[in-house]
């Protein structure tokens, strides 16, 4: 079976789309964003295509494209759309697949369904993106508890931001989770700079073996 990963985060706006682009490039993977909320600016799929240098064929169409940049349950309500979980089954392309959620794990898709509930059904190894800054210990450990409560397989944690060895140590030790690497903030976010940063700060072998 081809490699498949879910990319989620401890919060919104932490850089998980940028990391998803880096991983998509490194694995020469397909990319899928199940639900896109907000269409006026560059979408996550467009960002990944640009930063990963991925062809149109490797960027799989979203199941839902919602106009309002908000939590999917609200965006869908404003668009008069009903999100059907049956439409959120992961595609099976020929080759690796990177799937990106929205916001954090407990972001609602509907009034009764969270992203974490869908991830639990999928049973695809999840990579948790976390900040390095103040507050990340609590946010990340809570996210890991939510994952384990639902028996979602965890590939590891990716830190994003300036180096903070103590925060990273505490999270990996107390959270009993693998540190996959840290993506630093890039002065200029170009495809070349991103690919170089991934090569310098991550070991691709960590993404070629998945939890049993």
UniProtKB/Swiss-Prot annotation:
Active site per UniProt: 33
Ligand binding (Mg(2+)): 17, 100
GO BP term, example: biotin biosynthetic process
Entry EC no(s): 6.3.3.3
Subcellular location: Cytoplasm
Catalytic activity of the protein: (7R,8S)-7,8-diammoniononanoate + CO2 + ATP = (4R,5S)-dethiobiotin + ADP + phosphate + 3 H(+)
Keyword Repeat assigned: no
Molecular-function annotations in GO: ATP binding; dethiobiotin synthase activity; magnesium ion binding
Main location: cytoplasm
Binding site for ATP: 13-18, 100-103, 184-186
Keyword set, alphabetical order: ATP-binding, Biotin biosynthesis, Cytoplasm, Ligase, Magnesium, Metal-binding, Nucleotide-binding
Domain of life: Bacteria
Family: Belongs to the dethiobiotin synthetase family.
Protein's job: Catalyzes a mechanistically unusual reaction, the ATP-dependent insertion of CO2 between the N7 and N8 nitrogen atoms of 7,8-diaminopelargonic acid (DAPA, also called 7,8-diammoniononanoate) to form a ureido ring.
Protein name: ATP-dependent dethiobiotin synthetase BioD
Gene designation per UniProt: bioD
């Amino acid at each position: 079976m081809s490699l498949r990963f879910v990319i989620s985060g401890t919060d919104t706006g932490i850089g998980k789309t940028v990391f998803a682009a880096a991983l998509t490039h490194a694995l020469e993977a397909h990319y899928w964003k199940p639900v896109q909320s907000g269409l006026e600016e560059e979408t996550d799929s467009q960002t990944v295509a640009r930063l990963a240098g991925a062809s149109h064929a490797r960027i799989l169409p979203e199941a839902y494209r919602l106009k309002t940049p908000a939590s999917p349950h609200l965006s869908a309500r404003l668009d008069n759309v009903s999100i059907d979980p049956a439409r959120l089954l992961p595609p099976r392309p020929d080759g690796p697949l990177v799937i990106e959620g929205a916001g954090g794990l407990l972001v609602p898709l509907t009034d009764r369904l969270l992203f974490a509930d869908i991830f639990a059904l999928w049973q695809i190894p999840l990579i948790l993106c976390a900040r390095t800054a103040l507050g990340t210990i609590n946010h990340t450990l809570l996210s890991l508890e939510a994952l384990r409560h639902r028996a979602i397989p965890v590939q590891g944690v990716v830190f994003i931001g300036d180096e903070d060895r103590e925060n990273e140590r505490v999270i990996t030790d107390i959270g009993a989770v693998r540190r996959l690497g840290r993506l630093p903030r890039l002065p200029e976010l170009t495809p070349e700079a991103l690919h170089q940063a991934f090569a310098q700060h991550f070991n691709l072998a960590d993404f070629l073996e998945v939890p049993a």
